[in-house]
Amino acid sequence: MAGVYSQVTTGTEFWSSVFGRSGPVEIEIGPGTGAFLLQEAARRPQVNFVAIESSRSRAENLEALVRSRGLTHVRVVHAPAQCVVHHIVPTRSVAAYHIYFPDPWWKRRHHRRRLLTPAFARDVARTLVPGGLVAFATDVDFLWTMAIQCFVGSAGLTLRESAPPFRRSTRTRFEEKGLRRGATIYEGWFELPAEAGVAANASASTSTCGNSSNVGPTEPAQER
């Protein structure tokens, strides 16, 4: 996707180049086996979906499922999510992010690998369209606290109190494990205010994300 970004000037042009069509864009970070993504992509064909997965094997498996089901409006990216959102995703171009049961990285030496940071939350907020949402779920209480601190405290999103526009009808493997041990599930929707503006210097850079690569096609997939 980084190669496409260097050829266009707006978020609309960027995503149209990636998908070969216009439409709202939703991004799932850490899709795992892809249960949510595959179901939502089949249910809402008018939406363009991006899956960002840090595990190459999971990304390749998901890409194979996407292709086998003919979901031409889905792209799978193998890369660190923080890098993709910071360097590649254009400002005010994403309708929703889906972040379900991210790894808590319990060991102290692994804390730097955690997804949630104030900087990441601000990047997410920059890329959301006004009224855009971050759907977040976890069974780890401190991650829920971190989500509120990052998305509300650092990024200026609001914790939505009214009913969300969508609800998950699938459960992740980690969610199932949490429910079996009686864990509390924390779930919420963080919203960018409809009147949100854009900082004068807010933009994605054209840098690439290390040695990571797209598993999904960067050219629009052919209809089958």
Task: Give each language-model segment a name.
Residues 1-27, 35-44:
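S-adenosyl-L-methionine
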Residues 24-83:
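SAM cofactor-binding core of SAM-dependent methyltransferases
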Residues 94-114:
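A short SAM/SAH-binding and catalytic strip from SAM-dependent methyltransferases
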Residues 97, 124-125, 147:
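Class I S-adenosylmethionine-dependent transferase superfamily signal
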Residues 116-130:
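A short glycine-rich, Lys/Arg-flanked "PGG" loop and its adjoining helix->strand segment in the class I
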Residues 130-138:
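Conserved beta-strand signature within the Rossmann-like core of class I S-adenosyl-L-methionine
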